[in-house]
Amino acid sequence: MKAFSPVRSVRKNSLSDHSLGISRSKTPVDDPMSLLYNMNDCYSKLKELVPSIPQNKKVTKMEILQHVIDYILDLQIALDSHPTIVSLHHQRPGQNQASRTPLTTLNTDISILSLQASEFPSELMSNDSKVLCG
C-alpha cells in the first residue's frame, strides 16, 4: 500500500519522471538480480587485476578473494620492506608488529607461487610486516 500526500504536487505542469526516462534507483531488495550481476562484474574485474589468478581456468569466488588477500598482503610486505618505510618503522617505538600468517593453500598454483616467493631476496621476505587482518 502506498501512502499519498494530501498536498498537491508543485510540479503539475512538468513532465513526469517516467516520460523523461528518469527512474529512481532500486535498492538491492527491489532488484536482487541487478546486485548479483554487479557483484559478478566485480569478481571478474578482481580476477583480471590479480596476477596470481589463472585467467584461462575457472576459479570460485572464494578462491578469487583468497588470491586478492594474498596479493594485498604480498604488496604490503614489499612496501614495508622498502628502505624508506623500514626507517619510518624504526622511528616509531612501541608499535606491535607481528609476522604474517599465511592463508591455506588453495591449489597447485598457490603452491607454485609459494615456492617462487622463497627465491626472492631476504629483504623482501621480512618478518617485520604489519598484519592487515586480525
From Swiss-Prot:
The Gene Ontology CC terms held by the record are:
cytoplasm; cytosol; euchromatin; nucleus; protein-containing complex
Coiled coil, from the record: none
Q: Where is this motif: Nuclear export signal?
A: 106-115
**Keyword Phosphoprotein attached:** yes
Up-regulation conditions: Expressed in a circadian manner in the liver with peak levels seen at CT12 (at protein level). Expressed in a circadian manner in the suprachiasmatic nucleus (SCN) of the brain and heart with peak levels seen between CT16 and CT20 in the SCN and between CT8 and CT12 in the heart.
Q: Which residues carry this modification: Phosphoserine?
A: 14, 25
- What are the subcellular locations of this protein? Cytoplasm; Nucleus
Please name the SUPFAM superfamilies in this protein's record. Answer: HLH, helix-loop-helix DNA-binding domain (SSF47459)
Pfam families registered for this protein in UniProt: HLH
Instruction: Check the record and name the PROSITE patterns matching this protein.
Output: BHLH
Q: Where is this region: Interaction with IFI204?
A: 30-83
Pinpoint the bHLH domain residues. Answer: 23-75
Keyword NAD assigned to the entry: answer is no
Q: Which UniProt keywords apply?
A: Biological rhythms, Cytoplasm, Developmental protein, Nucleus, Phosphoprotein, Repressor, Transcription, Transcription regulation, Ubl conjugation
Describe the function of this protein.
Answer: Transcriptional regulator (lacking a basic DNA binding domain) which negatively regulates the basic helix-loop-helix (bHLH) transcription factors by forming heterodimers and inhibiting their DNA binding and transcriptional activity. Implicated in regulating a variety of cellular processes, including cellular growth, senescence, differentiation, apoptosis, angiogenesis, and neoplastic transformation. Inhibits skeletal muscle and cardiac myocyte differentiation. Regulates the circadian clock by repressing the transcriptional activator activity of the CLOCK-BMAL1 heterodimer.
- Write out the domain note: The bHLH domain is essential for its repressor activity towards the CLOCK-BMAL1 heterodimer.
Subunit structure, per the record? Answer: Interacts with GATA4 and NKX2-5. Interacts with NR0B2. Interacts with CLOCK and BMAL1. Interacts with IFI204. Interacts with NEDD9/HEF1. Interacts with ASB4; this interaction promotes ID2 proteasomal degradation.
Q: What is this protein called?
A: DNA-binding protein inhibitor ID-2
Q: What is the lineage of its organism?
A: Eukaryota, Metazoa, Chordata, Craniata, Vertebrata
